[in-house]
UniProtKB/Swiss-Prot annotation:
It comes from the Bacteria. GO terms for biological process: negative regulation of DNA-templated transcription. The keyword Repressor applies. The keyword Transcription applies. Negative regulator of class I heat shock genes (grpE-dnaK-dnaJ and groELS operons). Prevents heat-shock induction of these operons. GO terms for molecular function: DNA binding. Keywords: Repressor, Stress response, Transcription, Transcription regulation. Coiled coil: none annotated. InterPro entries: GAF-like_dom_sf (IPR029016), HrcA (IPR002571), HrcA_C (IPR021153), WH-like_DNA-bd_sf (IPR036388), WH_DNA-bd_sf (IPR036390). NCBIfam families: hrcA. This is Heat-inducible transcription repressor HrcA.
Length: 386
């Protein structure tokens, strides 16, 4: 047997593999020899195709559907397909996808809010759950505060910042407060953070309570903002999994949801993706190998996003293993380029900067001066309430 003959046979077998995988992705149905012959392999007999199927099955690339007798690609087949075909761009993206990508935010100082909007647009374009990782952006400031009474002695305080961060904390009240009193305190603090004259006249007790609530929530916010051990993670669109046949099985859906909601797993995949220069796919058993867990029976695709040439984080999508990889890779590439253009303009125009996580830096929790170094947020001294 000559080496050239073996190479030619291998080439045919791999062609059958790629064609079978492509057809399965298009139809979602097991592929039989007759179907494949009609689709792309008219020069081969069905018997020859079945022989190739058997060989690919023995190598772990295909598995037989016992109902129809057709073949279904395995995780290994999808890996081979992604490595050899996913980067080959289609002629053009669907018009609906292009229209959505054109809605991505322009340059602004609302970095986190804009990234979150971009995340929603990406999820809508791909109809998949999406996530992204982000560093912390420096010199942020509070732009709004909201206080909602949970019961007689608990309130939820919500801080909104200039860069689009939202921080929520539940605080206990030292004594019972009425809804009207809490509303007056909220209005007073809103005037303070917006640097406007107060519109509410508070009693001394309300002033003291307002100052206590504000300082408590700001200290908690600054501690969390400055002392962090991993990138921030934002996720959305879990319900989109329900539209896929693979996730109509409750056990498969539970595995996918559990994996996507595991912060450690998603942060690690996004960190890997951030250091690649192109979209990266993690398919089925590969996820099991990385984390030492049961196969989540899903796929995650990540792509880095940049400020100029500096990677800031990564976007990711999660879905069934039989994803339209070519379309997703192309969409993610165009999406990341648009995000890069917007971020680069924003960083230079607004002179923005950012910080990476510091998992081994104990000083942040011990030196109060470090808490304020990276933010323009200040505590409320007693004299400012008088």
């Amino acid at each position: 047997m000559s080496r050239s003959w073996i190479s030619k046979r291998e080439s045919k077998i791999l062609y059958i593999l790629l064609t079978t995988t492509e057809l399965y992705l298009k139809t979602g149905q097991p592929v039989g020899s007759k179907t494949l012959k009609e689709y792309e392999c008219s020069n081969l007999s069905t018997a020859t195709i079945r022989n190739y199927f058997s060989e690919l099955e023995s190598e772990g690339f295909l598995k037989k559907n016992h109902i129809s007798g057709g073949r279904i690609p395995t995780d290994l087949a999808f890996r081979y397909y992604v490595d050899h075909c996913a980067d080959f761009s289609q002629s053009e993206l669907p018009e609906s996808t292009t229209r959505l990508l054109n809605q991505l935010p322009e340059e602004s100082q609302n970095i986190v809010k804009d990234l979150q909007k971009a995340l929603e647009i990406l999820g809508e374009a791909l109809q998949l759950p999406t996530c992204f990782s982000s560093p912390r952006f420096e010199n942020d400031s509070i732009t709004n505060i909201q206080i909602s009474l949970v019961d007689e002695q608990r309130v939820v305080v919500i801080l909104s910042t200039e860069f689009g961060q939202v921080f929520t904390e539940t605080l206990w009240l030292p004594e019972t407060s009425s809804p009207a009193s809490v509303k007056r305190i909220e209005t007073f603090l809103q005037s303070y953070v917006r640097k406007q004259p107060p519109t509410e006249i508070l009693s001394q007790k309300e002033e003291d309570l307002g100052m206590t609530l504000y300082n408590e929530v700001v200290v908690r916010y600054l501690t969390r903002y400055c002392n962090f051990s991993e990138e921030d993670l934002y996720q959305t669109g879990l319900s989109k999994l329900l539209k896929y046949d693979a996730f109509k099985d409750p056990d498969t859906l539970a595995l996918g949801l559990s994996f996507f909601e595991n912060r450690r797993h998603m942060c690690k995949l996004l960190d890997i993706g951030m250091h690649r220069d192109r979209p990266t796919a993690f398919i089925g058993n590969e996820l099991s190998t990385i984390f030492g867990t049961p196969n989540p029976q899903c796929a995650v695709i990540t792509t880095p996003y940049y400020m100029n040439r500096t990677p800031l984080g990564a976007f990711g999508v999660l879905g069934p293993i039989n994803l339209p990889y070519r379309e997703i890779f192309q969409t993610l590439t165009i999406f990341a380029d648009k995000v890069k253009d917007s971020l680069t303009q924003s960083f230079y125009k607004f002179k923005l900067s950012f910080r990476r996580p510091c998992p081994s830096d104990p000083k942040l929790s011990k030196e109060p001066t470090l808490l304020a170094r990276y933010s323009s947020i200040k505590l409320l001294p007693p004299k400012e309430t008088s």
